[in-house]
A protein has these predicted regions:
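Conserved, mostly hydrophobic/aromatic
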Residues: 16, 45, 142, 190, ...
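Glycine-rich phosphate-binding active-site loops on the catalytic face of alpha/beta enzymes
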Residues: 23-34, 76-90, 141-151, 193-218
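N-terminal basic/disordered segments at the start of proteins
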Residues: 2-22
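C-terminal helical cap(s) of enzyme catalytic domains, especially alpha/beta-barrels
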Residues: 39-48, 90-103, 200-239
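Conserved anion-binding
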Residues: 50-156, 164, 168-175, 185, ...
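Glycine/small-residue-rich interface belts in oligomeric ring/scaffold proteins
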Residues: 28-59
Length: 239
């Protein structure tokens, strides 16, 4: 299992790298669960990280197909982009938007679709239905997150339900990632249900998700991740 830390700027990116994060994720927490950073800030994050770690970028929740394709194109040079489906509750538009993201992204950039455990409240497409959408779009993986940050993932979906979802993702040939107000205490459960990647922000910050990423906190989280089995993420997504 590997550790993704979401950062909102270059200073936080350097702290996450120094703390040992495996993936540096560009995201603006003030703009929601998948808030996209400005292009200049993404460029600054990429410069700060260099070749030290893969960088991912949140595209936000899907708008129209043209906007999604443009956002994916603007994130060229990252290892993967993450697309959410807040406000999208049926399969056909989800497929169209996911395909647009895949078309817009560079060929070397993987696509990760984001399902929300609290999909009824988001509202969004149910996580199990998003698996087929991901396969259709040529995505590399799926991330199960929470749209509203008022409860952690495993309080919304019990571990056995998450394990069933992860198994379906793996059966489709995709990797499974978990996020959603996770803490280090949740990592053992994430490993047990089969996730290849865990994503955090609040747990890595001093002052919660609106605070700043701490090198020491990232290092402490990485120590918990290192006990996990080796990742099976595709080599094209992470080195």
């Amino acid at each position: 299992m590997r550790l993704l830390v979401s950062v909102r700027g270059s200073v936080e990116a350097r702290a996450a790298v120094a703390g040992g994060a495996d993936v540096i994720d560009a995201k603006d927490p003030a703009r929601g669960a998948l808030g996209a950073v400005r292009r200049d800030r993404l460029a600054a994050i990429r410069r700060a990280v260099g070749a030290a770690r893969p960088v991912s970028a949140a595209l936000g929740d899907a708008g129209d197909a043209a906007m999604v394709a443009a956002a994916a194109a603007a994130a060229r040079g990252v290892a993967f982009v993450k697309l959410g489906f807040g406000g999208v509750t049926s399969d056909a538009p989800a497929r169209s938007l996911a395909r647009a993201a895949r078309r817009g992204a560079a060929s070397a950039t993987a696509l990760v679709l984001v399902a929300y455990a609290d999909w009824r409240r988001a509202p969004s497409l149910a996580p199990d239905r998003l698996v087929a959408v991901a396969v259709d779009a040529g995505a590399a993986g799926l991330l199960l997150d929470t749209a509203r940050k008022d409860a952690p993932l495993f309080a919304i979906e019990p571990p056995d339900a998450v394990a069933t979802w992860v198994a379906a993702v793996h059966a489709a040939g995709l990797f499974a990632a978990l996020a959603g107000s996770l803490s280090g205490r949740d990592f053992a459960t994430a490993r047990a249900v089969g996730a290849e990647l865990v994503g955090v922000r609040g747990a890595a910050c001093v002052g919660g998700r609106a605070g700043r990423v701490s090198q020491a906190r990232v290092a402490a989280l990485q120590r918990l991740v290192r006990a996990a089995r080796p990742s099976t993420l595709p080599l094209g997504v992470l080195p």
